[in-house]
Amino acid sequence: TLAMNTSFDLNNATISVNPVKTAYGYTGSVRDFKQGITGGVASYGDYAYYGDDTGILQCVDMNTMQAVWAIDLGESMMCTPALETEEDGGVYLYTGTALGKTGRSAQIRLLKIDALTGDIVWECQSAIKGKYASKDAKAGSYAGVMASPLVGEGEINDLIIFNVNHVELDDKSICAVVYALDKATGEEVWNQPLDVDSKSSPIGLYQRDGKSYIVMGDDGGTLRLMDGFSGTTLSTLNLGSAIQASPAAYGNEIVVGTTGGMLYFVELK
């Protein structure tokens, strides 16, 4: 955190700034991974939530810069957790794991966590096997949750949407798969393989009647419009280069960038 300690003198029309930086650090020996933070931070009140490449998800009080709780997810966490407050006053995180340079296949974990206690509410029981091609593969080949989950609204208010990269399917093919899980139980409602890898965070679009749509990109350069209730792909548009960032939307207008250095404006009709 950075306290700016500003002082404004109205009479002399001057302002002074005396910034004081407070840093939070920690050490761990859970796994032999680099202790980097790939994802972003979620926040609730004074609390900040983030995971690291060693698989430690933690809550830090931003006033005291002290850990409130920390849990070991067993594999790397590379996504920004999604946070939701429910009508009963509960505060929850949705997140998942990713495989580092292990050169192996392993189960990908999709979880709902109590944000105030760190207790695991549920873990998806679907057999989602992530496959890492080799220890020499590029970071883009990481298997697991690289994208932020989408907290459903409208007609999909009971769903949480995960984009899981580099999943090994029953026929041994590899691609990203979008999973819709029941927020209350973690049970799988639908899944949609994408045929290629994807690290793009899905966004939700909602009509006034609550009808829901999902927009996301993939490494093949395809911008995809999906039915949020069923997962069916309704329309696609290929932009020529990989889409790894999250699209931004306003009404029926979407802006998205590609790794080819282009920024596109797309209108939904």
What are these regions (language model features)?
Residues T1-K269:
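Extracytoplasmic/lumenal domain signature
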